[in-house]
Amino acid sequence: MNSTQSPVYRTSVEQKRHAQEVAKRQRMGNQMPRLREMLREKYRKRIIETRNRCTDAQREIQLSELREILRLELSELEKDVELEELILEELLSDVNEWYALGEKNLETLYAEPDEQQKEVLCPVCQIKNLRHHKGAFICECGIRFEHSANMEQLQILLQQQIASHELQCTQALRFFIEPASGQLYDMCGSCDYFSSV
């Protein structure tokens, strides 16, 4: 069987790969595994460094955002604290004014009568002084009541009413004008004290 054609070899893909591997080994000799290990180590280091750089960059972005959020929150809290301090100062000044006015009214109400003092503080509004005109007592707050006493006697009567009430109760008396009779009365909502002046 003589054939003029060249023989056909049937080699598989695996056989070709094996042949290539053998040829590489013969060319490179024993250096091939060391070179492969060295390249592997270099790539592994580069991957670790790249991953660390990316992670650090992400952390830095997150930290800067967190710092900015904290800075904004702190500035808002400082504004709130300043506002609360202003409100507290206003409240304290209001309380001090109210307390001073109350003290002044109490001093006027409980003042010892002397010959020169003819003024009596209005028991209803406790701000203005009463005026005596033709048997009636008038205040600028709008009240008017009739009483047979003069200014000094009325002041003594008011002080006696307050003192007798304070023996039984710690609350302040309320004075009012009864519309039908036009007389001055006092009462306490706490102890049910009620009396005419």
From Swiss-Prot:
GO terms for molecular function: zinc ion binding. GO terms for biological process: protein import into nucleus. Keywords: Metal-binding, Zinc, Zinc-finger. InterPro entries: RIP, RPA_interact_C_dom. A zinc finger (RIP-type) spans 122-191. It comes from the Eukaryota. Disulfide bonds: none annotated. GO terms for cellular component: nucleus. Residues 1-20 are annotated as: Disordered. It holds the Pfam family RPA_interact_C. Signal peptide: none annotated. PANTHER family: RPA-INTERACTING PROTEIN (PTHR31742:SF1), RPA-INTERACTING PROTEIN RPAIN (PTHR31742). This is RIP-like protein. It comes from Drosophila melanogaster. The gene is Ripalpha.
